[in-house]
């Protein structure tokens, strides 16, 4: 998939997530943290696994507040263990507090998928079998979940209905059988 399309999908998910979580403002943070307060926060790893979502996390911070500084110590695809520091983020405390939960949710989900994928990939080493993903993803998070599969060593099968023909039972049933399905597939569709 085109990198600009991927970036657009990620940006839209981030914007939707901010609207969902922050709404008209984080009333707690805005009422008790001075606007000029500066701070630093680190992403401390709590479980062993494969790290995924660093680039998306950086986009979360910069999309909310372009002045935030992010220093990355561990890249996507790296094996991590409890106590590792993946990154340090520095900037306005209000910005740090309003972005932390979205960043954590994304990274935890992506790292969980990458870790599980990696476990299956390791079990299949030495065979000709590959781990492929499906379209059965969380609505709106498909691109990130598929990125996580790749980071974990798996392969992306197809992104959506648009990038290949995959004849399934429902198609065969509605087309009137496998033979008719195949005839229709060989005809131009557009």
Locate predicted features.
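Acidic/glycine-rich phosphate/pyrophosphate-binding loops and surrounding catalytic core
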Residues: 2-182, 186, 190
């Amino acid at each position: 998939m085109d990198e600009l399309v991927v970036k657009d999908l990620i940006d839209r998910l981030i914007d939707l997530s901010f609207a969902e979580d922050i709404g008209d403002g984080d009333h707690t943070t805005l009422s008790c943290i001075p606007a000029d307060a500066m701070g630093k926060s680190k992403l401390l790893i709590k479980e062993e696994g494969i790290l995924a979502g660093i680039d998306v996390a950086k986009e979360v911070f910069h999309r909310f507040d372009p002045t935030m500084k992010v220093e990355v110590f561990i890249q996507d695809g790296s094996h991590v263990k409890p106590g590792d520091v993946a990154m340090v983020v520095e900037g306005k405390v209000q910005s740090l507090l309003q972005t932390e939960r979205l960043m954590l949710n994304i990274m935890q989900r992506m790292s969980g998928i990458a870790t599980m994928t990696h476990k299956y990939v390791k079990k299949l080493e030495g065979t000709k079998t590959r781990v492929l993903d499906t379209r059965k993803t969380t609505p709106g998070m498909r691109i990130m979940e598929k990125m996580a599969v790749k980071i974990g060593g798996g392969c992306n099968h197809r992104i959506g209905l648009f990038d290949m023909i995959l004849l399934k039972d429902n198609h065969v049933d509605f087309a009137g059988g496998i033979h008719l399905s195949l005839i229709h597939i060989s005809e131009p569709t557009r």
